[in-house]
Amino acid sequence: MLNTLMTHLINPLAYIVPVLLAVAFLTLIERKVLGYMQLRKGPNVVGPYGLLQPIADGVKLFIKEPVRPSTSSPFLFLAAPVLALTLAMTLWAPMPMPHPVTDLNLGILFILALSSLAVYSILGSGWASNSKYALIGALRAVAQTISYEVSLGLILLSVIIFSGGYTLQTFNTTQESIWLLIPAWPLAAMWYISTLAETNRAPFDLTEGESELVSGFNVEYAGGPFALFFLAEYANILLMNTLSAVLFLGASHIPNMPELTTINLMTKAALLSILFLWVRASYPRFRYDQLMHLVWKNFLPLTLAFVLWHTALPIALAGLPPQL
């Protein structure tokens, strides 16, 4: 009985609650970083240095009346944000930090498959809103997400060839001698740009182009349901950065200090997340055709070439004696 309780309730909660807390403070860091980069303070009234701002925001969002457009589809309108957050939380299950909640043999494929399912929540929310702006935003988001998943999948394939396994724990063993970032830096650069596009962040935030589409697919959402979308988006940002840290900046395990493993990994993920915010503060939005051109004309041929190269190299050099 206790074992079942641990597996189905306490373990997932021990993951979900810290992720939600991290998301809350990521929003605060984002506002602070953007503030200081625009030569202003950012939130600094609620609590010391604005530290309680995310709590105030959360309370404000959840006590607002959830307004629903009269012409919208009632079930789908509420199901979409719930699905978005559920997927965002489930994605954390196979992450090795240092031990995953569910030790999956195909952890990477699980993450790729579930992140593809997020498309349905976006499309559902845009369609259920029964608003032309929401629908245009949703269609843009879906096209962008699907396009960049192609390059993400191919980059993952190359990286899997490096590590020789689909489990995320193998990456720590692979990178004990050297970070994969160093031999595979073009892949790492393309991976990072693709994660920016995959999570709909600036400079690829065409789905939320305030100047054109009001707010994108979540334009009709307010209060609680909007907060769920918001949490899902930021949880995905943290997940993608943690994944980038595992894949390219791995080997967080220091043999004589195993306690530092999680701190090590999370520090890398936090630095990558701050880089996300820095990119947002620095770059203007892409034009839609440039966004698509980048992935289909630049990333796709390059990643395909890398997959071929990394597959062919060990086979071509297999006949050489190891002394060389």
From Swiss-Prot:
Example GO molecular function: NADH dehydrogenase (ubiquinone) activity
PROSITE patterns: COMPLEX1_ND1_1 (PS00667), COMPLEX1_ND1_2 (PS00668)
UniProt entry keywords in alphabetical sequence: Electron transport, Membrane, Mitochondrion, Mitochondrion inner membrane, NAD, Respiratory chain, Translocase, Transmembrane, Transmembrane helix, Transport, Ubiquinone
Any one biological process term the GO annotation gives: aerobic respiration
One GO cellular component term: mitochondrial inner membrane
Cellular compartment(s): Mitochondrion inner membrane
Membrane topology designation: Multi-pass membrane protein
Membrane-spanning parts: 9-29, 75-95, 106-126, 146-166, 177-197, 228-248, 259-279, 299-319
EC numbers: 7.1.1.2
Catalysed conversion reaction: a ubiquinone + NADH + 5 H(+)(in) = a ubiquinol + NAD(+) + 4 H(+)(out)
Protein family: Belongs to the complex I subunit 1 family.
Function noted in UniProt: Core subunit of the mitochondrial membrane respiratory chain NADH dehydrogenase (Complex I) that is believed to belong to the minimal assembly required for catalysis. Complex I functions in the transfer of electrons from NADH to the respiratory chain. The immediate electron acceptor for the enzyme is believed to be ubiquinone.
Listed PANTHER family: NADH DEHYDROGENASE SUBUNIT 1 (PTHR11432), NADH-UBIQUINONE OXIDOREDUCTASE CHAIN 1 (PTHR11432:SF3)
Name the UniProt record assigns to this protein: NADH-ubiquinone oxidoreductase chain 1
Organism expressing this protein natively: Carassius auratus
Highest classification ranks of the organism: Eukaryota, Metazoa, Chordata, Craniata, Vertebrata
